[in-house]
Amino acid sequence: MTDEQLALFPKGKPGRGSAGEMTRPVATLPANLTSNSSLAAAIALFYGHMIRQGFSDNTVKAFQADLRLFSKYIGSNRAIGSIGQADLEEFLTWMRSARGVPCSPKTYARRMTTLKVFFAWLVESEILPFDPAAPLIHEHPSTPLPMILYDDQVNALIRSTRDLLWAPKPDARPYLLVSLILQTGIKKSECMEIRPEHIDFSNPQAPVLYIRYADARRSSKERKLALGPGFTPVYQQYVREYKPRDRVFECTARNLEYVLEDAAHLAGIEGGVSFEQLRWTCAVRDYRNGMPADQLRQKLGLSHISWRETLPKIQRLARPAL
């Protein structure tokens, strides 16, 4: 294997490994729902919409609870077409200061997101002519920017793990793992579920990774991601060394975390390296290299809701120093 074969980010190909295609459920229009329908009826149909779109269980439960609270305040029989911006603002004020129950900034932000997503769905479905939640100002709770690897740390990590390919006792796993996450930005859980048949080597110079989910409700997160030409020879060496059968990584997730810790030590990176750190590093590098925002969202397998909070952080990390 040559250095050219193992190049992780080939020159002249910004954003390589970014196919990020995502399968989406077919949209279904709410049956028999009009602007005169009750809020309760709309909420019931919105539940089905969330399931079809692959919202996570936690998101579905949280949104349903938020809408129940809103329905209790404004009236479940209220016609959805009669709900205006002033009604939403009064609800938010009541929830924050007059309800008598503590409402943290994070909870407040989520409930506003619930209203925005709910009414945006009604407008997109042509049930309402305008969105009363659109003018609401979203106040995201301040959270620290995630830690990413600097360019010199990325280079050191790649170099040190690549050297293990030719060590007296060769080990392809560290380099395969590091390069895979830096190229694709997949989650730890997704990494653990990769099976050999999920990687298409029809074109060895442009292999493709398919991210699959057994749960049909997660189908919106399924996607195909391009891998660089250097992935093929490293994967072949890894297969010879580890002989995976059922899954590509047939160890525990904790074991792979140890692999990253050892790799960070070899690279001289203090504080270690985590899956999440590599995922954020991938996202920032792709955005900095000109990948369109929505393509990056699809590549990371994020919903539009999660993206509202994630994109500003990526933009702040990718922009030049002041």
Label the model's feature ranges.
Residues 60, 115, 177-178, 185, ...:
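Alpha-helix N-cap/helix-start motif at helix boundaries, enriched for small hydrophobics
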Residues 226-270, 282:
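Active-site/catalytic core of tyrosine-dependent DNA strand-transfer enzymes
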Residues 156-188:
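Basic, Lys/Arg- and aromatic-enriched nucleic-acid-binding interface segment
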Residues 148, 300-322:
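Catalytic-site neighborhood detector that most strongly recognizes the C-terminal catalytic loop/helix
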Residues 26-32, 44-145, 164-166:
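N-terminal core-binding DNA-recognition domain of tyrosine recombinases/integrases
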Residues 128, 141-159, 218-229:
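DNA breakage-rejoining catalytic core of tyrosine-based enzymes
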Residues 193-231:
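Conserved tyrosine-mediated DNA breakage-rejoining catalytic core shared by Y-recombinases
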Residues 172-173, 253, 270-290, 300, ...:
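Short basic/aromatic active-site micro-motif
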